[in-house]
Every structure is written in structure tokens, then in C-alpha cells.
Amino acid sequence: MERYDNAFTELKARKEGAFVPFVTLGDPGPEQSLKIIDTLIAAGADALELGIPFSDPLADGPTIQSATLRAFASGVTPTQCFEMLATVRQKYPTIPIGLLMYANLVFNRGIDEFYAECARVGVDSVLIADVPIEESAPFRQAAMRHNIAPIFICPPNADDELLRQIASHGRGYTYLLSRAGVTGAENKAAVPLHHLVEKLAEYHAAPPLQGFGISSPEQVTAAIEANAAGAISGSAIVKIIEKNVDKPDQMLTELRDFVTVMKAATRHA
């Protein structure tokens, strides 16, 4: 959990926002997946948001669903994902690593066992996409027992009560939704969410990172101008993987170029 605090403190000192890429672990295969993560970090990613492949990803648009299918096709299992996470953590001791996933995967291992495993491999946060905050108690309690930050989604239409709950129960960062719906670069992020960012700050919530539909440097700049602590980009990155499945070197080059440009947009003029 401390890795998020340290990262945000350092970024603030450098007058930068965070750029956080999302990829599915094991897409398009375990070996290339680790090379992708190396490339994202080398190009300037400030934290990682990683998915564990799941057979029924409700909140994901078609791009990330196909990433999941590619990972499945390469034979990736949740156990293998944890091994990959341990490898990444060993290589990069300070970068914050978050998981974005679904409750079924947690139930399959047992809630406490799942968070214990996260702690063992060096995961910092877990966002469970299909568990609303009012049903989150067993998950967040297990998370806190194992020093894992429970992450909550703040939707664009959040009322004061929800904002208070998010501030009270969330740690690490707050996932600020650009809009309701499923993920994807197909749907452009809407207007910057000044109002929500101000409210979250008023309730002392964890720093907000804006996600959903972030695919251009202009959107990153807009998120930071709205006082978000940074931006998360998933579908745009996964599209680069998809487009270059048969060209692994080209894939890494394009990912590096994309992350470099997106990271540059986090630097305040």
C-alpha cells in the first residue's frame, strides 16, 4: 500500500501526474506478457494495473475481452498469473502494482487466501469490478488484514453518501470513472470531472486516477487539469497488443512509443 503513497509523493515533487497502463496478464502469452510489462515500465509507467483472465468479464468492452481470450488460449491460469506477479515484483521493487478483476476469482481461492497470496507476491491493490461498495466488507477487511489497498470505483453520478463511503473505505487510489458503461477506447472520456475530484478531496479520499476511454495525451492532460492525480489507460494499450499479435517486436516498439507520449502528457507545463 505504501508504494502508492510514495509514488504520488514523488510525482507531486516532480510536478507530474501518474500514467498507469492496464494489460491482462498472460496476453498474448506468458513470455511476451512479461516483455510487455518491462516495456511499459521502461517507457515511463508510474504504476501498473493488471488483469487476471476471467471467463465472464462484465465491465470490459470487446477489446479487453479478446485480451482475456488470448491469455486463455495460451493456457494462462490464475496460479501462473501470481507467479508472473512475483517475477515483476522481484524485478521492480518500488512500482505500485494493482489488480483489476472479478469476485469469482477471489471466491475460487477463498477471500482471505486470495489476499494473502496477493501480499506474498507483492501486489499493492485490488479492485473487484463486480462488487459494489455496499457489498465489499468481507473483501476490504481481508485486504486490510494483508496490507492490500482496496480500490473503489467512483462513477460520474456518485452522490455525497457514495463519495463518503469511497473516501472512508478506499486506500491507495480512487478509480475515477470518466463515464458509466463498459471500458474501451471506442467511447471517448467525457468532460473532466472537476466536481467529483473536489468532493473526493473534501472527504480525504485516496488520490483519484481517471480511467475508462483514456486513449490520447490530450485526455491525460485534461484529467490532470481537473486535478486528478493521473490517468489509467487500458483498451488503447490492449489494442496495440491485438494489432501486433504476430509481430512481437513491433508490438513492443508501438507500446513504448504510446506510453512515452502518454507519460509526457502528465508533466505540468
UniProtKB/Swiss-Prot annotation:
Question: Does the record carry Lyase as a key word?
Answer: yes
MF terms from GO for this chain are: tryptophan synthase activity
Under which EC number(s) is this enzyme classified?
Answer: 4.2.1.20
Q: What reaction(s) does this enzyme catalyze?
A: (1S,2R)-1-C-(indol-3-yl)glycerol 3-phosphate + L-serine = D-glyceraldehyde 3-phosphate + L-tryptophan + H2O
- Indicate the residues that form the catalytic site: 49 (proton acceptor), 60 (proton acceptor)
Pfam families recorded? Trp_syntA
SUPFAM superfamilies for this protein: Ribulose-phoshate binding barrel
Q: Which UniProt keywords apply?
A: Amino-acid biosynthesis, Aromatic amino acid biosynthesis, Lyase, Tryptophan biosynthesis
What is the protein's known function? The alpha subunit is responsible for the aldol cleavage of indoleglycerol phosphate to indole and glyceraldehyde 3-phosphate.
Q: Which PANTHER family match?
A: TRYPTOPHAN SYNTHASE ALPHA CHAIN, CHLOROPLASTIC (PTHR43406:SF1), TRYPTOPHAN SYNTHASE, ALPHA CHAIN (PTHR43406)
The family this protein is said to belong to = Belongs to the TrpA family.
- The protein in question is named Tryptophan synthase alpha chain
Q: Which organism is it from?
A: Enterobacter sp. (strain 638)
